[in-house]
Amino acid sequence: MLFQAGHCQSRDEHLWPKQQFTHIREALAHLPDDVILDGELYVHGWSLQKINSFCSVHPNCTPKPNAHELIYNIFDCFFPLHPLRSFAERTHWIQSTLAHLPAPISVVPTHRVTAPLEAEELYTHYRQLSYEGTMYRDSESPYGTQLSCGNKENRWTCLLKRKDWQDAEFEIVDYELTTGKHNEQGFKLTCKTESGRTFSVGSGLSHVEMRDYVLAPPIGRLARVRYLALSDQGVPTQLTLEAIL
């Protein structure tokens, strides 16, 4: 979530209505208008699905009970009038300005590392605390604006996310070819969990494999799927097809 001058905006550029996250807006009301905070809404132990259920952008939505439990975890900031400030400078500003604030504001811990072993130890430490992973940044780099992130995934070359992935096998119950909005060919493979819930995966096959499976659909076979976590219903999220067995 981006925050500036009392406004909260999602990464897909939707503004949250003013009745959402009032506890966060009030906690940050003293900040100058020329800084944009970058972070995420989080409650340790809650699933992403549960957190998202509190984050409606509908103009007339009613905040859910317990919405005040959402914590704004801040990990970066941007100064439009000073766009070249380094990550080290921005981190210093965050620490000196925000670190003393109580909930619902939380400054994400940032550590300077000088050797791979230090990074490995910190990654292990935070995984043991049940966090998904860590983010590595170049301390001298400016904030990665959209103009700086020129590749199709909109990735900033000075930031690297590290997470653990899991894999499991699921029965395939349907397969079909798809066409994207730019007429590119794709596929949708529908799988079933042991509890009977279905989900779809649409990445991980070459174009040759896509066409081959039209002639000989893999229904009834097993798909090995790589995923980050399970939803509250036990369905894999952020998934990629590794293989059809």
Q: Could you say what each language-model-derived stretch is?
A:
Residues M1-A103:
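Covalent nucleotidyltransferase
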Residues M1-H14, C61, C77-P80, A99-L245:
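Nucleic-acid 5′ end/cap handling module spanning
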